[in-house]
Structure formats: C-alpha cells, structure tokens
C-alpha cells in the first residue's frame, strides 16, 4: 500500500471554506501529495470535478496513483499556478465553484534531500520547484553582489543580519551544498539564538527568489478571482508573513466599495466590491492539529467569496443547487453545464 507522507494542513477547514458541494467544480492550485484534492473529490461526489496543478512532476506522479480511483473526475496538470487562467482556458474549465492554494513547501518536498530545501542534510543547493527552471539557489549565492544578496535575504527572509550573512557568503563562496551554506550562516550570526536555526530565514529567502513565489502569488490571486462564479470561494493557506500580507491586502482591497482618496467628498471611482470576506480574522490550526502535525503551526487561512455585480455578463453559480448559471447584460439567467474536456494526467507548457 502506498504511503503519503504529507499530512494536509487544516483539511476540514479547507473543505468548509470552499463550501464543497456534490457536482461542484474545483481547482487545487497546489496538488502536492494530493491530500486536499482527495478530500475535495470525496465531498463533491457525485458529479464533482477537480483540476489539480503542481510544478513538481514527482508530485504529479505520486498524486496520480493516489487519485486514480476517481477516474475522469480529476485532471492533473504539471504546470505553475502562475499560469492558472491559461490552464483553465486550455481545458475549457471555467467558471469554477472554488479554488484552493496551500502555499509553501510540502513535507514531501522538504524531506526530499536532492531538492536542497533543507539545511538538515547535505544536498545540492537547488531549491527549484520544477527541474525545468533555470535559476537555482547556487546561482544566487555564487553570483550576486553584496547589495543584491543582502537585499534579497532581507526582503524575502526578513533577516535582521542580512548584510552580515551576505558578506560572509561572498567571502566563503563558491558553495555547492546546503550544509556548507548553513554552516557559514550560523558562524556569521554567532551561533544559535533560540529554537530557530540561524539559516532558516536565508533559506526561505533563497527559495522564494528561486521560484518567484510572491510575484506568482500576486498574479494567481487575480487570475483565480476571474475564474470564480458568483458565490465561488477562494481559500488560501499561507505559512509566513510575506505570503499572508499579500493575501490579506488583496482580499481587503477587492472587498472594498469606494476606493477614492479620503479628501474627495463624493465617490467618482464607481468601484464595486468583487469579494466578500468570509472570516474577518485569520483562521489558524487547532492545538490538536499542531500536536499531530507540528509543521502546521505557522499556517494561516483566509477565505473570500466572489461577488459578481448584475450586468457584468459573467458566470456565477447557485451554491444550494450547484448549478452553473450565466447572468446576461440584461440580467436574465441561463442554466447549463460547463465543459470539462480533460480527464487524464497532462504536462503543462
């Protein structure tokens, strides 16, 4: 029997946040080992459909085995969620009832030594989510100048010793392995100070830079919103403050009505809210989950619901019936089923 080492974080909260219904159509933007995808398929039965995306071909292969019992209900795509809208258009998979992002590293990726995400074991300085990417962590630490490296470690790692670490890296490079780099970082900051390893923030910064995680997230949130039907849910689980800040600010901006400056007495922007915040406060794992899965302790979940204004001519759905509807420019409603062409594992462009 195949074992799936990654324990999905806030699984029950994710299903509730998405509002999964039988016959619904969903997107899992971060497939990983397939735990969230499996639960979405189970709760959307009968008639549910799921498109799951991952940049890591090994994740696709593992999840394909796990989800094969769902047959044509699931489509696995080896691509980056930065291309979310193009993927959905390619497979005529729109509009959708819900979209999930479970950001950051899966336990499977973290434990895979050859990927170089962890400093606990010796491995090549890689950190690429997809082997097709050109830039690696080794490229950054071995070629960036002092200012560029220091700024990167501060911006993406929020590391207070960024300049000291960058200077030590320049003095000791070139680097080939994770343990070499971690050792230099630890010495640069004077050893351990508390529970967190001194290299943690720098490794986070390198991983974010290599995979362009923050810019991809910003782009994908807007794409996801455009794919949701009226009442559709957008659920995002983040693991550090940089990710959560992007999600929080995006949700708040899109949930606002008027966005005119305060010194303008009358609204002239005509901006309408396109999202409704389901939870005003961030959702965090229970103490029980954290004790069961310590890697969930930093997780934060935010949930928003799509609002489509009358006259937009955009798809929406009835959550109660799970029907795909269409609001015309005149406000009339047409009921129908959207197409779903793909049912097999595919490679992305």
UniProtKB/Swiss-Prot annotation:
A Gene Ontology BP annotation from the UniProt entry: rRNA base methylation
Has UniProt tagged this entry with the keyword Transferase? Answer: yes
Q: Which InterPro entries match?
A: RsmH (IPR002903), SAM-dep_MeTrfase_MraW_recog (IPR023397), SAM-dependent_MTases_sf (IPR029063)
Q: Which reaction does it catalyse?
A: cytidine(1402) in 16S rRNA + S-adenosyl-L-methionine = N(4)-methylcytidine(1402) in 16S rRNA + S-adenosyl-L-homocysteine + H(+)
An example Gene Ontology molecular-function term: rRNA (cytosine-N4-)-methyltransferase activity
The record's section on Pfam families has: Methyltransf_5 (PF01795)
Positions of transmembrane segments: none
Q: List the GO terms this entry assigns under cellular component, sorted alphabetically.
A: cytoplasm
- The UniProt annotation places S-adenosyl-L-methionine binding at 34-36, 54, 81, 102, 109
Look up the EC number in the record and give it.
2.1.1.199
Q: Which domain of life is it from?
A: Bacteria
Localization per record: Cytoplasm
What keywords are assigned to this protein? Cytoplasm, Methyltransferase, rRNA processing, S-adenosyl-L-methionine, Transferase
**Chief subcellular location:** cytoplasm
The protein's matches in HAMAP family, at most eight in alphabetical order, are given as: 16SrRNA_methyltr_H
Write out the similarity annotation: Belongs to the methyltransferase superfamily. RsmH family.
Q: What does this protein do?
A: Specifically methylates the N4 position of cytidine in position 1402 (C1402) of 16S rRNA.
Could you identify this protein by its name? Ribosomal RNA small subunit methyltransferase H
Q: Which gene encodes it?
A: rsmH
